[in-house]
Amino acid sequence: KAPARTKASPPVSGEIIWGFAMDSLLYSRTLNQWMTHAGVDVASPKGTEVHAVFAGTVQAVYTDDALGVTVEVESKDNMLAVYANLAAEPPVREGARLNAGDLVGTVGDTAISECGDKSHLHFELYRSGTPVNPEEYILFEKAQ
């Protein structure tokens, strides 16, 4: 029997307010439409520090039209973490090496597509280019 995989620490403290939904549709009040959701939204106050969930290299830092200020970090085992809705001017640059727990940025309000939701981090995880449910890899807080 294979040993259980140890889950990583979450990028930010808070409860998931929007779950991963690639096989079903969620209703976006902001966009007034049904849509899939390739990540999770973790409720956290604006300005809260966001930390790397695993060691890796910063692949991109950019502003996405829908998800706002975004940082992508790729691990050596082909996992890509996408941290979005960050505050402007994250402290990391493309090519930077990060360890698990290093500062990626802070929660912002730059995601136009999710501005109707409470303050949160939008977090996506990909394995070999395919979106995977972050809750299978990260130990997030559960609703009380």
Annotate each predicted stretch with a short phrase.
Residues T48, D77-M79, T130:
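Short acidic/polar mixed-charge low-complexity motifs
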Residues W18, S44, S75, L125-R127:
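Flexible glycine-/small-residue-rich
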Residues V53-A88:
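Zn2+-dependent peptidoglycan hydrolase active-site motif and core
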Residues K1-L67, A100:
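Surface-exposed, glycine-biased beta-strand/turn segments
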Residues D41, E72, V82-N85, T106, ...:
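Conserved beta-strand positions that form and line the central face of beta-propeller blades
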Residues G19, V61-Y62, L86, V107-T110:
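Residue-level recognition of beta-strand microenvironments
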Residues S44, E89-V92:
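Short alpha-helix capping/helix-loop boundary micro-motifs
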Residues A96-Q144:
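Conserved, short, structured surface segments that act as functional micro-motifs
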